[in-house]
């Protein structure tokens, strides 16, 4: 294997420092909020000089936006898992109930992850200052989740397993049955999320209530 040249080594060191800075900044933003986090703190926690931070990022706003966009971009793997569940072959009402339960449970688990809750809390707190970033977060997270559910409901409706006149509304209702109370509680009471058995109970109840309204 060829040894890395000076240019490649320099790029590697730069990438490492950039990662150190973004990791430290994310932890500080989540813990202290945007306004109470300084570039001095970020540099100290990252183990780099303040000049290095400013060499990578023009200002705190730029750093915050890049971090938030990067974190929301990591939602792809969760959506891939939800899509795989939603695309499970369904031919009977019982199949549909089981699939909805699995979809509800994975959806709940994803949103109840502490980093997800912390970032959502932070984005909401800074939405007035960063409206475009808040919009991006919504589009990449909650909206894509609703799009996925709506697509699955449409397919099941076409199979004759559901009768929902407004699929977007039905998707929103399913999402709230799954997330509503638990998410509200977790956002206001940090660290308090449903235990596994309770999550299973919520998922089953959400599927049952949804099918009671729209199942054929």
Regions found by a protein language model. Give the residues of each.
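Hydrophobic alpha-helical connector segments
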Residues: 66, 79-113, 167-174
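Generic hydrophobic, amphipathic alpha-helix propensity
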Residues: 17-25, 42, 67, 71, ...
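Helix-turn-helix
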Residues: 20, 28-67
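Conserved hydrophobic residue
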Residues: 34-35, 133, 162
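N-terminal intrinsically disordered/low-complexity leader segments
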Residues: 1-16, 79-88
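C-terminal peripheral helix-coil segments that are non-catalytic and often amphipathic
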Residues: 1-8, 102, 143, 147, ...
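Short hydrophobic clusters on alpha-helical segments that form packing/core surfaces
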Residues: 21-29, 107, 210
